[in-house]
Amino acid sequence: AAGLPSAQTRRERIQRVVDLLVANHKDLTEAINEDFGGRIPAYSVMNDVLGSMVSLKHVRDSLEEWMIRSPRATGAMQDQLGATAYVSYQPKGSIGIIGTWNAPLFTLLSPLACALGAGNRAVLKPSEIVPNTAAVLAEAARRTLDPVEVAVVTGGPEVADLLTSLPFDHLVFTGSTTVGKLVMANAAKNLVPVTLELGGKSPSVLSRSAYISSAASRLAIAKSTNAGQLCVSPDLIYVPRENTEAFIDAFTDQFTGLFPTIADNKDMVSIVS
């Protein structure tokens, strides 16, 4: 048996994913732009490429320290018998990772960094809502990565349903609460543990002492990032009644300043749906 993958092996696996991103970032960001019907590549580089790089490189450079056994205290009786206790961090095995469309690379490659750093192998399933991105990533993975270590599968909901029905050692899903329930139900049939990063409400609250202008500026930037298509994008704002009109005026001014025009504005991200 090969035994547990060494720190060097894990670093090499992660580095191959880093190399894939570097070599294919233009094709990937162009595919994202095509899938969105307009998303400036610079944003995709910042959010998906560099965002993924941060996770990959952090795990790559830190994993050896994380692999060290962690000592624990023993109970009184065991201690008297000379016992020692420790936590030994071992790979789970095979990890299924299902990403979402609004950050199609980051929601796959950031969890992948953790999976590879822990010595696991992984199967990635990009969102079918971004088919061009999924196809480019799958082809890049085929050329660059060992499919026994990291594989990419593409397809629609039926593929995701099949994937989540398999007896993985862990499943990671990013997406809607509705689909998250389906993922958990499928995983439960095989007692597969899951990590779910689901959507929800993201309210903002302005107090009476808030600076209306600066709050409006920050919220306009936050709401316009990726056209509001982020789980942390503010979708509800609580404003003191007496400040409502002042805030609406300030927010409108700030948003108009960011995007004086909509038509043919390459800085505007399109709505995927």
Which role does the model predict for each range below?
Residues 98, 174, 197-199:
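Short beta-strand segments
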